[in-house]
Amino acid sequence: VLIDPLSPDLSLDPLYELFKNPNVVKVFHAARQDLEIFFIDKKIIPFPFFDTQVAAMVCGFGEQVGYEKLVRSICNEGLDKSSRFTDWSARPLSNKQMHYAIGDVTYLREIYEFLSNKIKNNKRQAWVEEELKILMDPETYTIDPKYAWRRVKTRSSSWKMLAAIAELAMFREKYAQQKNIPRNRVYKDDCMMELAATRPKSLED
């Protein structure tokens, strides 16, 4: 089932009720951004849930492994990613976009079953639970704009650049919270790094 959360006449209440159902495991890949949206919108964190990226890390697939890699490695399938950078705010969505959206979740059940069995066999359930505790904590999604810089990964030791990153991260967080949009839609981290490094003095720069 495809659900368009931007549809003006669609109530998402049944979906949120499902999120609260303790008898249904909700499976995500790289859940943090999705969970943050649900928490900001309804103060709900789906439970119980399973993050295939976290589980894959515990199973030795590496940190922050992508969904596409897991589909190839576990399911021996490929994904059509040609619609990834199309305009997802435009309506109606094209058939190709809807096919992409379906593909983005089609293999989650198979990946979940493979990883959960591997975790049980290796007796690493506690490792996964420890990682998921962070994602289940409401404090994870309550961001003070002053401290938004802590989420930004940088190797720079330049105090000027670090100060610029702190200001840019604070502005982005404030704006994203005011407009209720993902922070990456304001500007992404790589764009922030470039701005912090060059520190333009005018719009022309």
Regions inferred by a protein language model and the residue ranges of each:
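Conserved DEDDh/DEDDy metal-dependent 3′-5′ exonuclease domain
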Residues: 1-118
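Accessory DNA-binding and partner-docking regions appended to nucleic-acid-acting proteins
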Residues: 95, 111, 115-205
